[in-house]
Amino acid sequence: MVSASGRRVLVFNGEIYNFTELHAELEQQGRAPAWRGHSDTETLLAAFEAWGVEQTLKRARGMFALALWDRQNRTLTLARDRLGEKPLYYGWQMQGQQPAFLFGSELKALREHPSFAGEVDRSAVCLLLRHNCVPAPYSIYRGISKLMPGHYLTLTEADLQAQRLPASTPYWSLAEVAVAGVAAPWQGSDDQAIRELDALLRDAIGQQMVADVPLGAFLSGGIDSSTIVALMQAQSSKPVKTFSIGFDEAGYNEAVYAKAVADHLKTEHTELYVKPAQAQAVIPRLPTLYDEPFADSSQIPTFLVSELARKSVTVSLSGDGGDELFCGYNRYQMTAQLWNRLGSLPLPLRRMLAGGINLLSPTQWNQLARKLPGAGSRYVNLGEKLHKGAGVMGARSIEDLYLGFVSHWPDPASVVIDGREPPTLVTGNRPDLRGLDGVQQMMALDALTYMADDILVKVDRASMGVSLESRVPFLDHRVVEFAWRLPQSLKLRNGQGKWLLRQVLYQYVPRQLIERPKQGFAVPIDAWLRGPLRDWAESLLDESRLRQEGIFQPAAVRQKWNEHLSGKRNWQHWLWDVLMYQAWAEGQKK
């Protein structure tokens, strides 16, 4: 869209939720153009004209990737939303003799340009093996970067002529928000905090419910999605459309909990029980959906619930972000507790303990766990957890311990031929988080990396793949900033995370419908790889094929594959990383 003055041109992907407020502010200041319509795009353009780039970005609330061309100054500005809900790729490419600066919210668009070289960056493959995704600012292609969340990048005409890439500029920083919040914590009472969070979430959800197309929500029956749906229903005169999927496999089905919450809130609920064959049929579509290799296997149920929702609605709200903001992941407590116990033990003794754990396979530990009194959900996947713990007993600090828990392949450069693992916010270029304790640092790093590069990527690509727009109310920056001001006692109390968020939810949903062990959104990839997916995986992991392609060390991959097939170890996550790269690379040949 071209601005009313004709000076600026905007290419925009996303939504500005407070555009009516910006529209009114422009009117009040006498800086509004002669409006041609009522869109957020036109309002955003007018805001750029009136307030400039940085002030407009600071005022806007939404999810977006945008490019703004200033015809007068001949500058190009790229910008991305605060938390990274929408992707933005950019970089110089030269195939043949013609260099070009390329940018877009999809790699598919860049690949269509004649100057696009398409050379795989082996450093990015190393990152994939550690994190199951390629974190910003890296991409799978050499010379192409992702703009960091909360940043903008301005290229002058001189930059474009000299083929330079200036550094990007932050207009909002989650790390700074975290440090400032911990330094000046909330001073109110518990009841005041409950009321404040309720009001903030209501407003964020209310703004994101504004749509001229059918709207609904994903509902798993967990704390986060149930809170979103409860506050949607509280503001709606009609039943909210909610969606969930279920699996018949024990330990993987949350649909029964979602239905109980939906029945209580009286939503218009749709559920689909997915057969293994239906879930497995999604796998060939994943490389196209995700643009670059992406190996979080919960991408499968995420796509399926998006596909289900799209049959009824065009926009769906999700509960992503609650774990990182309100201390929801079990690993936060587990890592801190484990370090408190292990930190005082001599390193040789810890290594002996690890060796003892590894004497039994995860399957054998699970069999023993089922014989313990009160087994049930308390010891689900105990073997995998023990082996994960054994793998990090050599940690020399709580930071090393955290890295061990969030890593798949511990030394990716030894698996990727000619690969060198570059630093990330987790492994080297850590942000300044002074004043935060160990648990708070893990929460901040998760929000900066795992949430931005895994969770939000998973949801955005899966939903956009079926033309469904996903919105994430927890990531309204006002909610994020308030969450970081909350003392840890309002997040973690009596050994339970999300204390404050639970209190908000209990105003709408009885606690007996919510209180249960955290389950996650997973599929039984480990069993599928030994069963119906075995031939597909064997083809992609064929030793001669790996040797010919020259990306992965065949011996390292085949060892994991053989141990997995035998049941000796569960290497599903490690193998899924390699398989998703292989499937993606195969798709690029077509």
Segments and roles (model prediction):
Residues 1-290, 302, 306, 506-507, ...:
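Cysteine-centered catalytic environments shared across enzyme families
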Residues 11-12, 124, 196, 295-300, ...:
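A conserved catalytic-core signature of glycosyltransferases
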Residues 31, 112, 142-148, 165, ...:
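Adenosyl-5′-phosphate
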Residues 82, 304-364, 397, 450, ...:
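Active-site adenylate/phosphate-handling loop in enzymes that bind or generate adenylated species
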Residues 219-220, 246-247, 323, 468-469, ...:
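Conserved short loop/turn motifs at secondary-structure junctions
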Residues 249, 274, 293-296, 344-347:
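Alpha-helix capping and helix-loop boundary segments enriched in small/acidic/polar residues
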Residues 284-288, 310, 332-334, 528-530:
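Short low-complexity, flexible loop/linker segments enriched in glycine and/or proline
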Residues 367-368, 380:
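DNA-processing P-loop NTPase/helicase core
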